[in-house]
Amino acid sequence: MDHFDYKGGRLHAEDVDMAEIAAAVGTPCYVYSTATLTRHFQLFDEALSGMDHLVCFAMKSLSNLAILKLLGDLGAGMDVVSGGEYARARAAGIPGDRIVFSGVGKTREEMAEALSGGIRQFNIESEPELRTLSEVADRLGATAPIALRVNPDVDARTHEKIATGRKTDKFGVPIKRAREIYALAASLPGIEVVGIDVHIGSQLTSLEPFEQAYLKVAELTHQLRADGHDIRRLDLGGGLGIPYTRCNEAPPLPAEYGALIRRTVGELGCEIEIEPGRLIAGNAGILLTKLLYVKEESDRRWLIVDGAMNDLIRPAMYGAHHDIVPLNETQAGVELQEADVVGPVCESGDTFARARPMPPLAEGDLLAFRSAGAYAAVMASEYNSRPLVPEVLVRGDQFAVIRARPTIDEMLGRDRLPGWL
């Protein structure tokens, strides 16, 4: 469900005509729906109702301060994977005790900053990281609450680049070594064992891999408690997928996911943490672009838009599909014609769609790339010296720019010429 719909033949974000945003902000730009973000968070919160739980938004998917504050005001915690994300969460008003710190490469400086801010939990990914955190905490006279991220060797059946729970992936420690490393953690100064963490991948469209992983976590919980560890939290990660095309079979709903959690680990009496990102943000955003040129040869047609791979890298990086629709609603019965939708960047990889059936379009028409709320703006770059795309948040009939497009002078101003040139 999202709140981008045609009204009177024009695509709207909630109650705002998208053309109005394009006129005020320019294109390309990202547009997010407050109503969609709110509803998607609430679906997860409701799915775990009656259980002690915290929904920690995976802010690597979308980290604008306005979005973080919106979700934080709804009661969300945050899952961060860098010192920069931690700083963003705190700047958005998220208290330390609602932040979990994940990631395989935490630095000593990041650990110290999070400890000083009363971090809820570190998700530890390796034995060397555990020893380093112990040293940092002991030096500060602090206690670091930790959950060990276990790798259950489960195939998430997702894209190769976003699978994280196989033994060949860089994440976590083999579940067979977990008891050994928990024993080490209990012996180290400055470390408090509070739970277990697991995360097997992103964009999962079946509950079966989750079930395999969570049953292994349940078994490990019993073993660790028998070993004397106070396992009171289970961080079950995120990864539930979204439909990137309306023709696809819909992935499981949060309610079904919540039922699985109750069935697999609900009797353990643990507080449950989950880290959804894509399902909260993915369909809550679109990339708004303008058609620059229609290029036609005898056997091929290209639609060249002003958005590019530096703005939305997912098609180039993952071969990802995004529905692309005109702001003016296509009438029933209109003949579609195949076209490649491409951007201005000087690479053949700057292609959003190949042989995509598209309605008749003219230069200057506006197009919306759907399902562009997650892993989109956060992965943008200034490749080809193109300014970062602005972000816009809509609420009802209002909209506001929540990240401005930098000027060329601002981009150039970050460079420095050494005096010897």
PLM features: what roles do these ranges have?
Residues 260, 267-421:
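Charged (often Lys/Glu-rich) extended helix/loop segments that serve as interaction or gating elements
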Residues 152-294, 358-361, 384-386, 395:
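Active-site loop/helix belt of alpha/beta enzymes
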Residues 1-144, 183, 188-192, 219-222, ...:
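A charged N-terminal "starter" segment
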Residues 59-63, 84-85, 105-106, 126-128, ...:
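Active-site-proximal loop/turn and secondary-structure-junction residues that shape catalytic pockets
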Residues 68, 91, 111-116, 133-136, ...:
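Short acidic, glycine/serine/threonine-rich loops at helix termini
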Residues 79-80, 123, 147, 197, ...:
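Conserved beta-strand positions in the central sheet of alpha/beta enzyme cores
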Residues 37, 60, 82, 114, ...:
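Conserved, mostly hydrophobic/aromatic
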Residues 56, 145, 233, 271, ...:
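Hydrophobic "anchor" residues on beta-strands that sit immediately upstream
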